[in-house]
């Protein structure tokens, strides 16, 4: 919970089965806490001095934080600095990569299906999606940190067939939505590569995810493939990169 720019952290004394129940508990506790101080003294909600009395110092922080689902709290300021310092320039060994035709495209949710030791195949492109605040993002230094959605350009620029797409924001499931939103750059890439030389070459797209977001992405992608009248494309779901 955020009040006047301060992130309020409440540690429940009991556990709940759902996130909604936990949030309701936290809201009730905070309202009760504020009412207690309100009845005891006069205060201005906009006063940081008074606010420090209303909200215990151990419950507040001016750092923006996000849970990584491992009971850890991430300092986003440090995380962004780490991301800037990483060397994402390591290249693969595919010769003439800008003219190379890849027959398989992997769309990977790196948050629930990490690929820290992925050895790339020369016939495949690996598109990895992850939140820039995620605790494991620093471990993907051998992937190319992409700067735009032009897949062909990013491959040519980096000489790398492992492309990392980071999304910024402390919102749960954000990388899942980013992955689905990336459908049209994939469609555009395939369309641009289908020339007379490769018109009969079959392309496989495999979506790697451990939750329902993978199926959402697949159904949306298949719809766009039909609308764009693209042929010789297979789309599948999996939980492993073969």
Curated annotation (Swiss-Prot):
Report the superkingdom from the record. Viruses
Query: This chain belongs to which protein, by name?
Result: Uncharacterized protein L218
């Amino acid at each position: 919970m955020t009040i006047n720019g301060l992130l309020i952290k409440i540690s429940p004394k009991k556990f709940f089965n759902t996130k909604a129940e936990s949030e309701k508990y936290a809201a009730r506790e905070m309202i009760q806490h504020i009412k207690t101080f309100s009845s005891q003294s006069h205060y201005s909600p906009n006063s940081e001095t008074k606010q420090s009395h209303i909200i215990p110092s151990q419950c507040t922080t001016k750092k923006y934080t996000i849970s990584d689902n491992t009971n850890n709290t991430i300092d986003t300021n440090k995380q962004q600095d780490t991301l800037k310092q990483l060397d994402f320039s390591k290249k693969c060994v595919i010769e003439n990569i800008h003219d190379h035709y890849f027959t398989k495209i992997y769309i990977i949710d790196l948050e629930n299906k990490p690929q820290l030791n992925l050895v790339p195949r020369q016939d495949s492109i690996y598109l990895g999606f992850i939140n820039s605040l995620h605790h494991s993002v620093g471990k993907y230094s051998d992937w190319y940190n992409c700067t735009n959605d032009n897949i062909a350009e990013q491959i040519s620029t980096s000489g790398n067939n492992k492309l990392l797409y980071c999304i910024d924001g402390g919102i749960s499931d954000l990388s899942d939505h980013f992955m689905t939103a990336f459908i049209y750059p994939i469609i555009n890439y395939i369309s641009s590569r289908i020339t007379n030389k490769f018109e009969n070459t079959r392309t496989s797209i495999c979506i790697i995810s451990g939750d329902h977001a993978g199926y959402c992405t697949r159904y949306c992608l298949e719809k766009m493939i039909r609308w764009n009248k693209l042929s010789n494309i297979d789309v599948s779901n999996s939980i492993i990169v073969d």
